[in-house]
Amino acid sequence: MVHELVDLAAMIRSSPAWRAKGHIAVVRDVFGPSDWLRGPGDDGAVVTVGGEQVIACGEAILPAFVERDPHGAGVAAVLANVNDVAAMGAVPLAIVDTVVGPHETCRAVLDGMRFASHVYDVPVVGGHLTNSADRVALSAFAVGRCPARPLSATRVSPGQRLALVACLEGTMRADFPFFPSFDERGGDLAGDVRLLAQLAAEGVIEAAKDVSMAGLFGSLAMLLEPTRCGATIAVDAVPVPDGVTFEAWALCFPCFAFLVTMAPGSEDRCRRAVEGRGLSYAPLGTLDGSAALRLTDRSHTVVLIDLNVDTVTGL
């Protein structure tokens, strides 16, 4: 029914995670227009070092999450950075961090980072710690080596195929919109996050974005934003983990979920590589030049965002 699609679109657009992305516009206000690849805008910035491309990125973790679950926040700090590096088609090399809080909070954060470091096979090589009795903060930063052309959102273009690559094994947290897969996926996650660099090096995929705090459709809108491409997504084409509602899945931060684009004819190679690792591959359609991200139930269609007149990040 059309009213259900309208309600779904309204729920997505009004979610705190989507609305929070609008604050990124202050970066443009201060630093000026972004070229997306070497400035603010993409999942990571590309820095050329000795003829090699290095991806640099960083993440700040929600203070309320650090207070509630410092160990989980430490895990998330590594996860978010590793996924950002992967989304650029790079192999993660190292993590550094900044931690502020009471002694036991800092210990729990670092223990979470140590756990995730082992899971993803990425060392935590340094950082900064400030002991504070009444303040908590956590940020982490990563570098990665990009062996091929970066999977930048600037490479998104009409005619490319769009797919969701994801791990559907996991359990949704009750307190925060996170879908961890560590118990279910374990050490396979280290290879999972390196898959995108392999697909990029083989020329299979053109661009990518990890599904993060903006949720599935917010992340997709951000992928389409720099080149003003459009897409029509059939809601029944989106795979959803068992025991999770579509609405919760659409708004959560999964442990492993990436939106990827590729040239027509590359879908089979991408699918084989993804499913060969036991991950889910879901084709979501073909990108167009409309600048509109639309949702459809195959009978009715609603516009979630028209990037010709609206913006997600303001960059």
Q: Model regions: which residues?
A:
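Extreme N-terminal cap/leader segments of soluble proteins
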Residues: M1-V66, M88, D97, R107, ...
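Acidic, Ser/Thr/Pro-rich beta/coil linker or hinge segments at domain junctions
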Residues: V2-E4, E275-L315
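A generic local secondary-structure boundary/capping motif
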Residues: S34-W36, G44-V47, N83-D84, R114, ...
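Small-aliphatic-rich amphipathic alpha-helix that forms the alpha element of a beta-alpha
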Residues: D69-I95, A108-V119, D192-A200, L216-M222
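Active-site-proximal betaalpha loop/short-helix elements
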Residues: E104, G186-C255
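Short, compositionally biased
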Residues: A174-L189, R277
